[in-house]
């Protein structure tokens, strides 16, 4: 994701990469009126009550379980994106960058120890929406993950 531009618009990607886009479909995250593109190679995994209590609102994994994308909606007590960014750095996140995705301000970052790339948005309700994917070191999966992140938009 370090190759991510600071301003990303799905319409630009869609025009350049119709073949890739055709290999997935938009899913809606009901809790927060957000939709995002998810490749068909990643299937939704049923969440347990424990997952839901942990803030997970979606989990998508390849059939061989070698790659996954998690969608988390967590209460951060109204923390601003700037405050969240500072907390990320304090907790070992690297490559923390400000981005704008389809008009929404966000932060991208990397968790090296778990080979995970993440994007986070704060919401008016005082929550943070995070989309995280692993393994980011897999070039093919990293490309798919960047598409997923670039597709996040309001409904």
Region roles according to the model:
Residues 81-82, 119, 139-144:
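A short, polar/proline- and glycine-enriched secondary-structure boundary/capping micro-motif
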Residues 82-86, 152:
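Acidic Ser/Thr/Pro-rich low-complexity disordered segments
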Residues 22-31, 58-62, 97-101, 109-111, ...:
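Short acidic-hydrophobic surface loop/beta-edge motif
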Residues 29, 44, 69-71, 93-96, ...:
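Generic structural motif
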Residues 1-56, 114, 125, 132-155:
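N-terminal targeting sequences that direct proteins away from the cytosol to non-cytosolic compartments
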Residues 58-83, 128-132:
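A short acidic-to-branched-hydrophobic micro-motif
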Residues 37-38, 70-73, 119-122, 131:
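Short amphipathic beta-strand/extended segments with alternating polar/hydrophobic composition
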Residues 85-128:
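Signature of long, low-cysteine stretches enriched in small and polar/charged residues
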């Amino acid at each position: 994701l370090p190759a991510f531009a600071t301003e990303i618009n799905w319409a630009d990607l869609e025009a350049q990469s119709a073949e890739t886009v055709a290999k997935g479909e938009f899913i809606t995250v009901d809790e927060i009126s957000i939709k995002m593109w998810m490749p068909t190679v990643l299937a939704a995994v049923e969440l347990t009550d424990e997952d839901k209590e942990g803030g997970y609102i979606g989990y998508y994994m390849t059939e061989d379980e070698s790659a996954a994308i998690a969608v988390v909606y967590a209460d951060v007590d109204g923390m601003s994106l700037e405050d969240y960014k500072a907390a990320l750095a304090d907790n070992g996140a690297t490559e923390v960058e400000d981005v704008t995705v389809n008009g929404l301000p966000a932060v991208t970052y990397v968790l090296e120890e778990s080979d995970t790339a993440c994007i986070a948005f704060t919401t008016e309700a005082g929550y943070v929406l995070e989309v995280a994917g692993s393994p980011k070191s897999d070039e093919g999966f990293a490309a798919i993950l960047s598409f997923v992140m670039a597709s996040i938009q309001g409904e």
